[in-house]
A protein has these predicted regions:
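Terminal connector regions
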Residues: 108-146
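Short beta-strand elements of extracellular/lumenal beta-sandwich folds
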Residues: 46-61
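Short acidic, flexible loop segments centered on an aromatic residue
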Residues: 61-78
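Exposed aromatic-hydrophobic patches
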Residues: 101-106
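Short beta-strand and strand-turn-strand segments in soluble, beta-rich domains
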Residues: 75-90
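Short proline/glycine- and polar residue-rich coil/turn motifs
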Residues: 90-100
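Low-complexity, acidic Ser/Thr/Pro/Gly-rich terminal tails and inter-domain linkers that flank the onset
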Residues: 11-45, 146
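Hydrophobic core residues within well-ordered beta-strands of beta-rich domains
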Residues: 50-52, 100, 117-119
Length: 146
């Protein structure tokens, strides 16, 4: 399996002219991802919100078209009604070594009981447009509801 994968990458499967080596992006993690909740807790069974601050750094030598997907559990939402559970933030092209910070507001409501909720983050490196994916980095973070 390893012998077949290397020649395909060297052919530049993702490049229009077939000359670009993308093995570094495919094999290694292209991003450094860190998160902070502001404030760090949310109140149970009350309408309220907090902001998920996401810092994303491109650690490759090339610019990457980047987006972040945030997925919430059932009792939280991205709007006051709590209906939206997934959001994609299109960051655009990040240069080599560039760092960007994105804030996403998360709402709790009357159905959010106390406990710890897991939020999934996925940072995606795209090629050409947002429909083609080269690599992705996933991270879980938890929000405490008291």
């Amino acid at each position: 399996m390893r012998q077949l994968a290397d020649p395909v990458r060297k052919m530049g499967l993702f490049n229009l002219f077939g000359k670009k080596d993308v093995s570094e992006i495919v094999n290694n993690s292209p991003f450094k991802l860190s998160t902070v909740w502001i404030p760090y807790t949310l109140y149970a069974n009350r309408n309220g919100s907090c902001t998920l601050s996401v810092k994303l750094k491109n650690v490759t030598e090339e610019p990457l078209l980047t987006s972040i997907v945030v997925e919430l559990p059932q009792s939280l939402g991205f709007d006051k009604t709590g209906m939206t559970k997934q959001r994609e933030v299109r960051i655009g092209e990040m240069g080599a070594g560039e760092e960007k910070e994105v804030g996403v507001e998360v709402f709790g409501g009357l159905k959010s009981d106390s406990g710890e909720y897991t939020v999934m983050l996925t940072a995606i490196a795209h090629y050409r447009d947002y429909g083609h994916v080269i690599n992705a980095v996933k991270k879980r973070t938890s929000l405490k509801v008291v």
